[in-house]
Amino acid sequence: MDEIKIQLSEKDIPKQWYNIAADLPNLQPPLGPGGKPISPDMLAPVFPMNIIEQEVSTQRWIDIPQEVLDILYQWRPAPLRRARRLEKFLNTPAKIYYKDESVSPAGSHKPNTAVPQAYYNKVFGIKKITTETGAGQWGSALAYACSQLGLECKVYMVRISFDQKPFRKLMMELWGANCIASPSDETQFGRKILKQMPDTPGSLGIAISEAV
């Protein structure tokens, strides 16, 4: 039987992140609402400076902090699986593989970035992180990351998903996060939306506005 799963050992986990910006010398800067390039100062009200520095960095390799690695070791390296049935369905001679990120505590690839983002917030002195989530995957990932790093976490979850996916909410709460249906009466913007559309299912844009 052909091998359908490739599983590396913990010693093979990467110790550095690769920054693709180093190999994209003509990469255009992100633009703000006015159509002009965003400066670090414009991001400072939302993100800590050490994360902003990475956002604009052109350094090719960035060392992964040991505290981050210690958390990632709980499920990484994730297995590489061969999609034999998909190959058969497509009638292709190609070998198709996919990275199985369902093995993470939150069940997706999102803890891979949630953990380092929470870590760098902690290093900067942040005690509480507020975020938004649509269907709940990102909220679950950040709730998990904050639980591992001793941070408070508040998540505004799009109301329709909040109602339809109670187990995602439960998962976030098990990790100590405060999960709130958005729009909510906790923010000025949320109250404005509820007044205009009391039966709104919410949207990711509304949740982002409440979190910010």
List where the protein language model places each region.
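PLP-dependent amino-acid enzyme catalytic core
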Residues: M1-V212
